Regions:
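Conserved ABC ATPase signature
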Residues: 230-234, 238
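Catalytic Walker B motif of ABC-type/P-loop ATPase nucleotide-binding domains
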Residues: 255-258
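H-loop/switch region of ABC-family ATPase nucleotide-binding domains
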Residues: 13-14, 290-291
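Conserved ABC ATPase "signature" region
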Residues: 209-226
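Helix-to-loop junction immediately C-terminal to a conserved catalytic motif
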Residues: 155
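ABC ATPase C-loop
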Residues: 247-248
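Conserved ABC transporter NBD signature motif
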Residues: 162-176
Length: 313
């Protein structure tokens, strides 16, 4: 335990609730300048108004959203699929959630008997999963459970066995690459433009460009002041906001966001949540992968928890 050993620790962080009983002193930075310094006790005693005025994230743990579905759950809900392998799936949703999902089953993505493996190690074994249009579905679970792998399958970057339908029609992986857009956890793999503004317009024909819309999106994501800078020169949080803004510029049917709140403060977390909600309200299929309970509370409609599979092939 570094704290108990007397070591000097410096933690640069937006997520604060887990730092109770760890930090002794708090320094607030703005524009590269120290704007406030205080004992940690003063931070934890702040009112909600003072906290949000300072742009700080939640000081106490957010009540977790309960999953409506648990995939790969090792319990009596296990059942055999047609191939004889175990499909561990437990539905713990309320009746209202079940009824709502059933009315939307024909609209959106439906995965059936989906299986994916790395060599002899099976990562995904999903008898059925519905990802409806017009709602934000959150995938949660421990590292290594297969969340990011599933998102790559959804947008056609990985091929899996089984059937994936969009609005009742089977769509193969090649077609899904055209219909889907993914914001990866490692945003550096998605930054290609020479300037921030250019990043938002890559791949969009000039006849379809709307400069006013580009300006609005830059403003919404707090990127106007860095519009002429190279994307790789931005801070981690600015890069995260840029790839989310780029997703907002394209017109796709399936949007996947892998840890989209990484490096975001209170204001920018909520602007990102607003963007995600806007896409859902535009009747798109929207999926987020996150460990961030604040983001879930801000934009998720329901939660699917993925447990790691324990069996190999």
């Amino acid at each position: 335990d570094l704290h108990a050993s007397g070591a000097t620790m410096v933690i640069a962080e937006h997520r604060l609730s887990y730092l109770h009983d760890i930090v002794d002193r708090v320094i607030l930075l703005d524009g590269g300048r120290i704007v406030r310094e205080m004992p940690a006790a003063h931070l934890w005693a702040m009112s909600e108004r003072e906290r949000t005025d300072l742009g700080l994230r939640a000081l106490r743990p957010v009540t977790p959203m309960q999953p409506s579905l648990v995939l790969h759950a090792e319990d009596e809900g296990s059942e055999k699929n047609d191939q004889g392998s175990t499909a561990h799936t437990t539905d713990i949703s309320t009746q209202n959630a079940q009824d709502d999902a059933s009315t939307r089953s024909a609209r959106g993505l439906v995965l059936e008997n989906l299986r994916f493996s790395y060599g002899s190690h099976r990562v995904l074994n999903i008898p059925r999963l519905e990802l409806p249009r017009g709602r934000v579905t959150a995938l949660v679970g421990p590292n290594g459970a297969g969340k990011s792998t599933l998102t790559r399958v959804l947008v056609g970057l990985e091929r899996a066995r089984g059937t994936i339908r969009l609005d009742g029609r089977i769509i193969r992986s090649k077609e899904r690459t055209k219909l889907g857009y993914v914001v990866m956890q490692d945003v550096h793999r998605q930054l290609f433009g020479a300037e921030v503004r250019e990043e938002l317009t890559l791949g969009i024909p000039s006849k379809d460009l709307d400069d006013d819309r580009v300006d609005r999106i830059l403003i919404d994501h707090g990127l106007t002041d860095v519009a002429e800078r190279h994307p790789m020169s931005l801070s981690g949080g600015q890069k995260q906001r840029l790839v989310v803004a780029a997703a907002q510029m394209v017109d796709k049917e399936i949007y996947v966001f892998d840890e989209p709140s990484s490096g975001l403060d209170y204001r920018h977390l909520h602007s990102t949540a607003h963007t995600i909600r806007d896409l859902a309200e535009a009747d798109k299929v929207v999926v987020i992968v996150t460990h961030d309970e604040e983001l879930l509370a801000a934009c998720a409609d329901h939660v699917v928890k993925i447990q790691p599979l324990t069996r190999s092939l």
